[in-house]
């Protein structure tokens, strides 16, 4: 194996790979992009009636470049698991540590499961999460085709569980909102050309945004 091949292999994700330690700060600019990008009312937070939104932590999920395959055309977020110990604090800096926990197959995709912990300055763990990112490695396509949910084979029927229902809300996500939520960074979540370069026909609304709306509902309920 050549030195180039060895270097490329080392750059690809592998189970057990330790990712570099990073720092994450809950800045005022971050909070502004969160509330404005999601078009959420921030009055209760500014008045001290609610804590820092739980899903501000999605910005600590920044290990894509270290945990992604080189073939990124058509890659998509698949799912996320969150475990919170206590709320994040405004203007506090936290340490993130990551590790690739698993790589598995899901239909025609290869999924990288990255486990991340976030700790405060005293070393106490504040939260942890697992990010599942999927990649098309077998036969990358020119344009990614999405299936209609009701046409998927073996589609599971969702049964509403017992319990107290959460009050929902409607929100139309605009391209401008996507741009602000992702801090003006150009990506397939904010820019049509960047999206087409990855095989998508339109800008892809970031999974972090949809998770943030769910987090907003849960924060308000509990």
Question: Residue ranges of each PLM-predicted region?
Answer:
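Polar low-complexity intrinsically disordered regions
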Residues: 1-2, 121
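Hot-dog-fold acyl-thioester-processing enzymes
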Residues: 2-79, 140-222
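Hydrophobic beta-sheet segments that form the core/acyl-binding groove
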Residues: 78-122
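FAD-binding core of flavoproteins
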Residues: 106, 138-140
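A structural microfeature
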Residues: 126-129
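Short beta-strand edge segments in extracellular beta-sheet folds
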Residues: 132-136
């Amino acid at each position: 194996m050549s030195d180039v091949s060895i270097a490329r292999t080392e750059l690809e994700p592998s189970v057990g790979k330790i990712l570099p330690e990073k720092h994450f700060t809950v800045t005022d600019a971050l909070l502004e992009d969160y509330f404005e990008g999601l078009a959420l009312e921030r009055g209760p937070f500014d008045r001290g009636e609610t804590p820092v939104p739980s899903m501000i932590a999605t910005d600590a999920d920044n290990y894509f470049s270290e945990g992604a395959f080189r073939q990124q055309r058509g890659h998509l977020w698949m799912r996320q698991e969150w475990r919170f110990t206590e709320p994040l604090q405004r203007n506090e800096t936290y340490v993130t540590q990551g590790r690739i926990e698993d790589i598995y197959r899901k239909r025609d995709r290869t999924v990288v499961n990255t486990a991340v912990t976030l700790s405060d300055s005293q070393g106490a763990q504040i939260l942890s999460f697992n990010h599942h990112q999927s990649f098309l490695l077998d036969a990358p396509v020119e344009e990614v085709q999405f299936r209609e949910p009701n046409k998927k084979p073996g589609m599971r029927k969702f049964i509403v569980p017992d319990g107290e229902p959460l009050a929902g809300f409607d929100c139309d996500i605009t391209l401008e909102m996507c741009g602000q939520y992702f801090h003006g960074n150009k990506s397939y979540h904010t820019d049509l050309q960047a999206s087409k370069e990855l095989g998508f026909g339109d800008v892809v609304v970031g999974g972090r945004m949809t998770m943030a709306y769910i987090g907003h509902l849960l924060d308000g309920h509990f």
